[in-house]
A protein has these predicted regions:
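Non-heme Fe(II)-dependent double-stranded beta-helix
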Residues: 1-14, 19-110
């Protein structure tokens, strides 16, 4: 997937880029189901709220096939490489599962 000039300009001016059609609704639903499967398993990479609700799943690309594919998918990787002008690799990957009305706040970040 190649970004157009306007998308590249927006990223450099505003610091973000939203690509709502990058993945199909079916692909998104598949990943949502994969995430639910990850949250249902008790493993050290899945951090939980005091209530037991999942908060974050770290490194899912290393133990889940769906998220492994996502982490290497050209529609995700190629636009980022285009923006940064160099090859990249997955350094950190997490899925935030903050349940509404449950758990601690998320700290501001960039």
């Amino acid at each position: 997937m190649k970004l157009n000039a306007q998308q590249v300009k927006q990223f450099h001016e505003e610091g973000w880029l939203f690509l709502p059609d990058c993945f199909s609704p079916q692909e998104v639903e598949t990943l949502r189901a994969e995430a639910e499967g990850i949250y249902s398993v008790d493993r050290p990479e899945v951090w939980r709220e005091k209530s037991g609700a999942p908060r974050t799943a770290f490194a899912a690309h290393t133990y889940n096939e769906g998220f492994g594919i996502l982490g290497r998918h050209p529609r995700l990787i190629e636009p980022v490489e285009q923006l940064f002008g160099e090859k990249l690799y997955m350094h950190q990957f997490k899925i935030n599962a903050k349940a509404k009305f449950d758990g601690d706040v998320w700290q501001w970040h960039q």
